[in-house]
Amino acid sequence: AEGDGSVDTP
């Protein structure tokens, strides 16, 4: 996700 601080993207 975007901007959620997950492992996917920052």
UniProtKB/Swiss-Prot annotation:
User: To what use is this protein put?
Assistant: This enzyme is capable of clotting milk and thus can be used for cheese production.
UniProt pH dependence: Optimum pH is 6 with hemoglobin as substrate. Activity decreases from pH 7, with a 36% decrease in activity when incubated at pH 10.
The domain of life for this entry's organism is: Eukaryota
Molecular function, one GO term: aspartic-type endopeptidase activity
- Reactions accelerated catalytically: Hydrolysis of proteins, favoring hydrophobic residues at P1 and P1'. Clots milk. Does not accept Lys at P1, and hence does not activate trypsinogen
Keywords assigned by UniProt, alphabetized: Aspartyl protease, Hydrolase, Protease
Report the family membership.
Belongs to the peptidase A1 family.
Q: What is this protein called?
A: Mucorpepsin
Name the species this protein comes from.
Answer: Mucor thermohyalospora
Which lineage do the record's taxonomy fields give for this organism? Eukaryota, Fungi, Fungi incertae sedis, Mucoromycota, Mucoromycotina
